[in-house]
Amino acid sequence: MSYNPYAYATSEQNGVNDRFSHTPQQQRPMQIPRNTPVNGQGNANMNANVNGSGGGFPFQDPRGSMAFQLGQSAFSNFIGQDNFNQFQETVNKATANAAGSQQISTYFQVSTRYVINKLKLILVPFLNGTKNWQRIMDSGNFLPPRDDVNSPDMYMPIMGLVTYILIWNTQQGLKGSFNPEDLYYKLSSTLAFVCLDLLILKLGLYLLIDSKIPSFSLVELLCYVGYKFVPLILAQLLTNVTMPFNLNILIKFYLFIAFGVFLLRSVKFNLLSRSGAEDDDIHVSISKSTVKKCNYFLFVYGFIWQNVLMWLMG
């Protein structure tokens, strides 16, 4: 007869088992072994073991591995060596322009409060005074639009362009003369007017301002040029409102004049603030004659040219 060690269980142990068998389901506390590390020590030890495994070899760059070289050679053979070289140049240029793309992304950092204040600044620029138009600098860089209402942005010009085209499309549909080809013509003509406006502003500042003096970037000028869609949209909506003809003309005239004041002060004050007064590397100041020429140019550009351009676009 074989020996059974469980046959000699004591009555005390049987009593304990019976007691637990008649007791409702109880949750026993989980016991953590003494040798088990707590919290992140286990992960740290595990990472240390993983990093230290393999005989202590350091992590190698995957570009120097045999698999990467084989894949690179196979890809170059598949698309051709010339195409592969062109692909590498494109990737290098995209990597080099990463910093520039990050700078462009700052022009889209807007908030609801900024958009409302910017609309007030465009429609009622007289309430902002004549000294509150300069952008705010912090650590040598301008603050993003969400922190400075005087900072230009790309959000409002892009949304203004889309809204302007959609409103024009809706008006054509209400008249019963909608045509998809006209939509393409309107979009292309609007973009052509914007490019022409940008070219005139950039060329005028280039001829008047010394090249040693820092001026606006092309993106910043595009932002200021794109703000014209705010009065254009309101002028479009006025055509569907029943009112006296003289009142309609008066409101449109005010919108165009207000935009001219906004454009004149925004470009003027921020252009003169970049004359090197706070820059140690540039010791060139704008002469009084240059300031007068800039004022004359911005006056003609903001009040005369903008009215003619918006009349053609509207």
UniProtKB/Swiss-Prot annotation:
Query: Looking at the record's lineage, which domain of life comes first?
Result: Eukaryota
Q: Name one GO biological process term.
A: protein transport
| N-acetylserine, modified sites | S2
Topology relative to the membrane: Multi-pass membrane protein
Provide the alphabetized UniProt keywords: Acetylation, Cytoplasmic vesicle, Endoplasmic reticulum, ER-Golgi transport, Golgi apparatus, Membrane, Protein transport, Transmembrane, Transmembrane helix, Transport
TM spans, by residue? 154-174, 189-209, 218-238, 244-264, 294-313
- A Pfam family that this protein carries is YIF1
The disulfide bonds in this chain are none
Taken from the record's topology, the Lumenal segments are: 175-188, 239-243, 314
Q: Where is the composition biased (Polar residues)?
A: 10-32
- Subunit-structure text: Component of the YIP1-YIF1 complex, composed of at least YIF1, YIP1 and YOS1. The complex interacts with the ER to Golgi SNAREs BOS1 and SEC22. Interacts with the YIP1 family members YIP4 and YIP5, and with the Rab GTPases SEC4, YPT1, YPT6, YPT7, YPT10, YPT11, YPT31, YPT32 and YPT52. Interacts with BTN2 and SNX3.
Similarity-based family: Belongs to the YIF1 family.
Q: State the name under which the record lists this protein.
A: Protein transport protein YIF1
Give the species this sequence originates from: Saccharomyces cerevisiae (strain ATCC 204508 / S288c)
State which gene encodes it: YIF1
